[in-house]
From Swiss-Prot:
It comes from the Archaea. GO terms for biological process: DNA-templated transcription. It holds the Pfam family RNA_pol_Rpb1_5. The gene is rpo1C. Belongs to the RNA polymerase beta' chain family. This is DNA-directed RNA polymerase subunit Rpo1C. NCBIfam families: RNA_pol_rpoA2 (TIGR02389). It comes from Aeropyrum pernix (strain ATCC 700893 / DSM 11879 / JCM 9820 / NBRC 100138 / K1). Its EC number is 2.7.7.6.
Length: 407
């Protein structure tokens, strides 16, 4: 490597060689290190450039194959270790191989959608304000605050027994319940039909509700199945919250010299949650990659794929170079939407009929290729191996002609 006489000269060379983010970090590090001589700082810059150049893929390197191996091999260990659901806090979280498959298959919705919601400073430091934000987000129906619904065959009036503690926990008032019942169009609250009682020291509110004849015709008054259908609708009456958010838990996160409260959310509705004034939209994330692509764009989805795969591997105690994950994320997102790796995505869109046939549904792929008169260019690795030809990677990417002996 060229010898540099001054620090400025070495940094100028680094500016042309290193990525912008790495260059800025190098400059900041060198400038704030007062204990190093200029010669030492030049050595740091040279070593950074040398390390970066050594990290670059060589021309002809089969980076796709290496990336596949780098994730596939740890995947066999994940199968043995974590092919199950593990309880984290109060939620079931998909871990290990099942979650990895969800990510690379680009599932429309994950089996266990979760959101990690960070709050703005005025809410993040106050537990009560954080709880209030959680109550505002959680989708609350009548079923979540009642003990039971008492009813008798032949009587349209049912008694909805509401637990006052449940109401307080969910941030619901009696007026909110009455308004929700009025909007349900299942019937009406009878006049003076609200009573407060106490049973065994537990406060309860009983609401007497008359089911409309449209929901329960006279001929169905003695049909228990008809009653249960209406009562199920009654339990699902919406009171407040954001659709898709099933449960919210407040968690305290400790930093080096500070703390903050954040929300772990079971369910996902990124668009509406990010619009809330309490939410810090810069840090809040979801594990639903398709939703991220729709709400925040394809670049955000690419970052989410990298972070989700990285988290799955780390949870299993595995360490994979992030550049392999970046390559896979690029492959899944470069068309502008999130596509799966399999035959309905990356593999299925390959121009080579032999490469497509080698993955799945071989006969169908060959049949369709013949019908449409597709040509095999032998440009990829798979098709060349099938045909017994040297793949165009490594030394096979260079065409050589033997020189004839000169007379």
């Amino acid at each position: 490597m060229k010898e540099f006489k001054t620090l400025e000269e070495s940094l100028e060379a680094a500016r042309y060689i290193l990525p912008e983010s790495l260059y800025k970090e190098l400059v900041e590090t060198v400038e704030k290190e007062d204990g190093l001589s200029e010669e030492d700082k030049i050595s740091v810059v040279k070593e950074t450039i040398r390390t970066y150049l050594r990290s670059l893929a060589q021309p002809g390197e089969a980076v796709g194959t290496v990336a596949a191996q780098s994730i596939g091999e740890p995947g066999t260990q994940m199968t043995l270790r974590t092919f199950h659901y593990a309880g984290i806090m109060e939620f079931d979280v998909t871990l290990g191989l099942p979650r990895l498959i969800e990510i690379v298959d680009a599932k429309q919705t994950p089996s266990q959608p979760l959101m990690y919601i960070y709050l703005k400073d005025e809410y993040a430091k106050d537990l009560e304000k954080a709880k209030e934000a959680a109550r505002k987000i959680e989708y609350t129906t009548l079923e979540k605050i009642i003990d039971n619904i008492e009813w008798d065959l032949g009587d349209r009036v049912v008694a909805i027994v509401i637990n006052a503690e449940y109401m307080e926990d969910k941030g619901v008032t009696v007026d909110m319940v009455l308004e929700a019942l009025d909007k349900s169009k299942l019937g009406k609250v009878v006049e003076d039909g609200v009573r407060e009682v106490s049973e065994g020291g537990v406060k309860k509110v009983i609401v007497y509700f008359e089911i409309s004849d449209k929901q329960l015709p006279d001929e169905e008054l003695f049909n228990s199945n008809a009653y249960h259908k209406v009562l199920e609708k009654l339990k699902n009456t919406y009171i407040k919250g954001i659709k898709g958010i099933r449960k919210v838990t407040v968690r305290r996160e400790e930093g080096e010299d500070s703390y903050e409260y954040m929300l772990i959310v079971e369910g996902s509705n990124l668009r509406e949650v990010l619009m809330l004034p309490e939410v810090d939209h810069r840090r809040s994330i979801s594990n639903d990659i398709q939703e991220i692509a729709q709400v925040l764009g394809i670049e955000a989805a690419r970052t989410a794929i990298i972070e989700e795969i990285k988290r799955v591997l780390e949870d299993s105690g595995l360490d994979v170079d992030i550049r392999h994950l970046m390559l896979i994320a690029d492959l899944m997102t470069w068309p502008g939407y999130v596509r799966q790796i399999g035959r309905l995505g990356v593999v299925g869109e390959k121009p080579s009929p032999l490469a497509r046939a080698a993955f799945e549904v071989t006969v169908k792929q060959l049949y369709e290729a013949a019908v449409w008169g597709e040509e095999e260019e032998f440009a990829g690795v798979t098709e060349n191996i099938i045909a017994g030809l040297p793949p165009r990677v490594g030394t096979g990417s260079v065409l050589l002609r033997m020189g004839a002996a000169r007379k």
